């Protein structure tokens, strides 16, 4: 029969062998899931773009709303997969915004808007929506939708979700359409 000490040592050994625990999405007081690796932003998009570019990453904005079942799936299914989390963390800075929120965000052109007004400016109507922005310093001079290099609207299964992030990370949008990229991947 194992002593308590032996049992505790064996349990600790199994826990260590399993590897480090993966961070899980946390439900915020506002009713949103949040990943601990999302960017803590002052909500000044031009500055966030500069810092992500300096870190060798691309900028993505995820729009969510309280009670959105597919937003929940993005966090509890897609972001919960270690391969997806690792890929996104290596290649992107991600900012989370509320489709109906009132926090003030400074857009690339210096215009200050509430989250709800910013969403309307970009034509974001549903959640989850993920916008991907080009790492260029002239975005302020472009129309809002022309600033994006890709957009995910709605929930995508993990494989397709990861492929959309790869399309941007690999800058495949500079060489052709998403459709051509996905065809080459199949």
Regions found by a protein language model. Give the residues of each.
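Typically the conserved alpha-helix immediately C-terminal to a functionally engaged Cys/Sec
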Residues: 72-87
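N-terminal secretory signal peptides and thylakoid transit peptides that target proteins
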Residues: 1-14
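N-proximal helix/coil linker or "cap" segments that precede and/or mark the start of modular domains
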Residues: 24-38
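Non-catalytic, surface beta->alpha helical segment in thiol-disulfide oxidoreductase systems
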Residues: 126, 134-173
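Short active-site neighborhood of thiol/selenol oxidoreductases, capturing the structured segment around
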Residues: 55-69
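Thiol-based oxidoreductase modules, predominantly thioredoxin-like and allied folds used
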Residues: 85-113
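Structural micro-motif
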Residues: 115-131
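A short beta-strand-turn-helix
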Residues: 41-58
């Amino acid at each position: 029969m194992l002593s308590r000490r032996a049992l505790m040592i064996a349990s600790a050994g199994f826990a260590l062998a399993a590897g480090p625990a993966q961070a899980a999405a946390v439900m915020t007081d506002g009713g949103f899931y949040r990943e601990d690796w999302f960017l803590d932003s002052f909500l000044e998009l031009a500055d966030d773009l500069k810092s992500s570019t300096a870190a060798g990453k691309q900028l993505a904005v995820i729009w969510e709303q309280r009670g959105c079942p597919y937003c929940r799936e993005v966090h509890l299914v897609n972001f919960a997969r270690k391969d997806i989390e690792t890929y996104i963390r290596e290649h992107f800075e991600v900012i989370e915004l509320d489709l109906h929120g009132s926090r003030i965000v400074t857009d690339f052109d210096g215009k200050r808007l509430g989250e709800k007004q910013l969403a309307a400016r970009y034509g974001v109507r549903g959640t989850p929506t993920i916008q991907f922005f080009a790492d260029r310093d002239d975005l302020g001079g472009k129309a809002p939708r022309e600033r994006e290099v890709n957009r995910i609207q709605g929930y995508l299964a993990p494989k397709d979700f990861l492929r959309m992030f790869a399309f941007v990370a690999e800058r495949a949008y500079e060489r052709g359409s998403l459709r051509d990229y996905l065809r080459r991947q199949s």
